[in-house]
Amino acid sequence: MQGATGVTMPYQGTLDDQVAAGLLHQRIIVLGAEVDDQVANRLCGQLLLLSAEDPRQDISLYINSPGGSVSAGLAIYDTMRLIPNDVSTLAMGLAGSMGQFLLSAGSRGKRFSLPHAQILMHQGSAGFGGTAADVEIYAGQLERVGTLLVRLIAEHTGQPVEKVEQDSRRDRWFTAKEALTYGLIDHVLERVDDVRPAGARRMVGVRA
């Protein structure tokens, strides 16, 4: 495959690494795990790399994740907003919590779901202890972050902030069609070409 420098490099690493490298060559990034700092660092790096390689072509983010760290997810979100490229998103299997947030944060008109994907929206929560002062500080931070996420989801879905806040107080599950109606996505995917980046390149040595 060719890297951002145009130098042809042989595949190395495990089969999973080879698949990830092949998809990255097609401008496809996969979020297929819980969102943590390590996953966020990898995805942010991939977004920045693909943007540097071509700042005009779309990048696709495929999501099958139960969610995870809010700070890690916001790092991915901010990187998606930072780069000039449109980032299309696709829900596969499960887009839960932070996975749902990143799904709805895709470029308008380019947010997709497979027909039987499940999408979960809820407010973040965490167990914490310590002194009364520590608990109060942490609770205040959790409330501020929760308010931020609700505002951003409302912005990306077109729903009133009050409705998003109310709907996310408890687990709110969506089918693909329900997510479409709510504004979390723009299309239920029928053809792979609908979500494949226009700048995707055919891999040398890989048969169709």
Label each PLM-derived region with a short phrase.
Residues 1-98, 105-208:
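N-terminal organellar transit peptides
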